[in-house]
Amino acid sequence: MAISDNNTGVHVLLISYPSQGHINPLLQLGKRLAAHPGVRCTLAVTRFVLAHSNTPSTGAVHVVAFSDGCDLRGYDEAGDEATFLARLESSGSATLDALLVAEAALGRPVRAVVYDSFLTWVPRVARRRGAACAAFFTQACAVNVAFAHAWAGRVELPVVEGTTGNKALLPGLPEAGLEPGDFPTFLTKPDGGCRAYLDLVLQQCRGFEEADHVLINSFYELEPKEAEYMASQWGAKTVGPTVPSAYLDNRLPDDVSYGFHLYTPMTAESKAWLDARPANSVVYVSFGSLATPSAHQMADVADGLRNSGKPFLWVVRASETPKLPQGFTDEVKGGRGLVVTWSPQLEVLAHPAVGCFVTHCGWNSTMEALGIGVPMIAMPQWSDQPTNAKYIQDFWRVGVKLRPDAEGVVRKEEVERCVREVMEGELSEEYRKNATSFSDKAKKAMSEGGSSDSNIVEFLAKIRLNE
């Protein structure tokens, strides 16, 4: 889709938190908005991200840069989370303000700013320049509801992890309740990680009250109770899945991939290897762009995959490859497995050879698997991932969750057991059927007149009317 230079109509600026998992969903929303007549979309990413991304392809969305105060080395330049977040607010506020002034001077004033919910300072800047603001929450509705209850003081922190029979029953969450270990780790271990990030995920809830609009990266049919609760409390609208159109409704020409890639995928190798495998035979394994499992854990995953007897494609980032058992990559390369440093995940999940996805349960990966219809084996690491894993196994029934031992390690026997259960167990067909059903619902939600599409249309209508 070519970029239009028409300055008339509505100009929407989208500004993202500087990580790949936050940038691409916002970009995909921008592509959806820009597909409507008379809408100009501009995505603002940090100077560091723009300088270090692999030739971004953003379709009809223009791209500009703002500063997070760490232009040369990104997060590493700050040294710690609190310093980084402080710089992000200080430099981000100043450069966003300058961007809004510059766009107005060019005759294309910004009517609305859609901001990542982590950037709680954006509404102050946007309103100063006469723009409406919409908070975009990249997490599941369920996770947002859990954070909102904690923010309001209805959940006492820490939620005690590891206990059973002590389920929390909270409005907007399943009637069956959540056990302590099902909550995001920021709530179960508020002092065990970074306090700055706990404050960040709770402070984002200000967006429910301060933003003119609240948009959620989910779809109604996936989380109806949670979505209805958010709509009743804050007027929130689901606008996802924010997955490229080629894997959903196919209404946006050439929208076949995300625009920003901080890693280079081994596309040719992955495709050639998958092409040589039978349908539904391959176990795809990826723990995302941030997870850092221990060498002990990596060894158990390796042994479990090997012992399952199933062919596997495993993404192990270059920084993590030293943790693999010595000689493992060469041992399996003959046909049983392929280890790559990064993969074109959407293409891999959509490949007929892939039978299941061993995932860290990051929300983007979860939405991709649901949108494409691939059963999952959940191995959550931190943040919102335990909640997503709970839904994968118990509420959506599209897979199983790996159970760690008392030391927190998922043993090789457990990896083998779960791979066999999802790939060939008595419930394997149910998992695949349920995954296919959610894929159909995701496609319908983003198709013309679907739940998410209708919410996007309604949002634009309100922006046009300055509501």
Task: List where the protein language model places each region.
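Glycosyltransferase specificity loop/lid
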Residues: 1-467
